[in-house]
Amino acid sequence: MRSHYCGDVNKSHVGQEVTLVGWVNRSRDLGGVVFLDLRDREGLVQVVYDPDLPEVFNVASTLRAEFCVQVKGLVRARPNSQVNAQMKTGEIEVLGKELTIINSSEPLPLSLDNYQNNSEEQRLKYRYLDLRRPEMAQRLMFRAKVTSAVRRFLDSNGFLDIETPILTKATPEGARDYLVPSRTYKGQFFALPQSPQLFKQLLMMSGFDRYYQIVKCFRDEDLRADRQPEFTQIDIETSFMTSEQVMAKTEEMMRGLFLEMLNVDLGEFPRMTYNEAMRRFGSDKPDLRNPLELVDVADLLKEVEFAVFSGPANDEEGRVAALRIPGGASLSRKQIDDYTKFVGIYGAKGLAWMKLNDLTQGLEGIQSPVLKFLNEDIVNEIISRTGAQTGDIILFGADNATVVAESMGALRLKAGEDFNLLEGQWRPLWVVDFPMFEKINGSFHAVHHPFTAPRGVTPQELEANPANRVSDAYDMVLNGCELGGGSVRIHNQEMQSAVFRILGITDEEAKEKFGFLLEALRYGTPPHAGLAFGLDRIIMLMTGASSIRDVMAFPKTTTAACPLTNAPGFANPQQLAELGISVVKAAKTED
């Protein structure tokens, strides 16, 4: 039905007859000549109909927005005065000779031109219309090209694209599973995979030493701008490669991807340990475009008569951190109060501050409600450590180390945006040397997942002292977003059992949930390592979209619903009976 895409017609086609199909983006009658902007996935082209062909002209006069049509005509150059530099096809137009209305369109329930006026609910309910917008179409086409480039790289490096099951068994990976009831085994359930983690490890045990898959994963978790209940991973696993080799290979892939798709050279990725990232930036995925850093000052404040500072300063699990904001002395009291409320979201009880109005006047040139508790030597050392100057403000977080990191790390990002401090467009890095475990309510939990290998310890040493052990794990971070995370895996049954016990999984539970893995580890398991990238998040960053919903064809809402299909929906009683399931209504609570 077509000879060319609309957006591909150019000056080289002048004098040629073309056949185009697409949608009427806009139609206008100017002095007896009808101009159509015809749109398809590749772009727009202007089609002109004049009264010399009255039959065709009359049909063209009836066209409305979003009619689906076929156009046959002659490509001609536009006069210089009519060249449209804003259009890819702006140097030419098509003189229409034939016109077929393939399908008419009713008035749209949402605007494609002023899409900002459409609610998120509308856009998702009529997603098939929203995707006609050039911006949305370009993102999905960009995504397809990225996916193709990733496949080419991995294929050329000896990786095998192998599918793993979607119906599988629940595993403890940090979020709730989506469960699928079994009709054959009533009362039993499959789980949709949160990742192909165990299957890709089993593939390494099978001898397929380089695996990849671009795969759907499912997590029933609370949603944010960068989360969806179903999402896509670039999943990679290798045998006989160290963490350094995996990082080098995947960095090569990412650098090549940015160069090919955006003509951006990311350069070599710097390395930073988890502890350094948390100390300097309050985050394990720091945005290095932001020059602000947290500075420890607890050692200066142990003896001050101000419990807000001295309490955490003398607590092994406490921290006092200072954050210097250049030019921040201009902040009003209300703005400081707003910052105080902001850190309160992260559990901080308050926010001390120090305005450096004029350092030539010594303490007289400093404004702060806590200044009376600090002597001049302490103040001068804080100023020296933070590198603060006249006109700056220093903000203080004092609490347990976790609260300080989370609250001041978030404030660092907010202040960087508020004061327009971000430098450069792309700042990648690797974060390495993650803790093996974290303690929550007195119990150990895996920082990555239970199959991550510790670094440099025996199973006996790990069980004897699990705290502060370092894992052989690594995250690739770009502009404050985790692009992907991975690790060396445990390939020894004794070590895997030890990790399970540390996590509170008894040997009996481990056998029930992971018996297949523990048995597989007995049969010559090779050392193996891998990494998984969030494809949706990569596309979001590369296209500048504000949400991963804008780079997915049919995403869910933030409440994990689909307005287009009205999913999730109720199952009919016969289906439930076949599955042996009865629905229990939630009891009504008394007011």
Curated annotation (Swiss-Prot):
Keywords: Aminoacyl-tRNA synthetase, ATP-binding, Cytoplasm, Ligase, Nucleotide-binding, Protein biosynthesis. InterPro entries: Aa-tRNA-synt_II, aa-tRNA-synth_II, aa-tRNA-synth_II/BPL/LPL, Asp-tRNA-ligase_1, Asp-tRNA-ligase_1_N, Asp/Asn-tRNA-synth_IIb, AspRS_core, GAD-like_sf. Residues 197-200 are annotated as: Aspartate. Its EC number is 6.1.1.12. L-aspartate binds at residues 173, 219, 448, 489. Pfam families: GAD, tRNA-synt_2, tRNA_anti-codon. ATP binds at residues 219-221, 228, 482, 534-537. HAMAP family: Asp_tRNA_synth_type1. Catalyzes the attachment of L-aspartate to tRNA(Asp) in a two-step reaction: L-aspartate is first activated by ATP to form Asp-AMP and then transferred to the acceptor end of tRNA(Asp). PANTHER family: ASPARTATE--TRNA LIGASE, MITOCHONDRIAL, ASPARTYL/LYSYL-TRNA SYNTHETASE. NCBIfam families: aspS_bact, PRK00476.1. This is Aspartate--tRNA ligase. It comes from Shewanella sp. (strain MR-4).
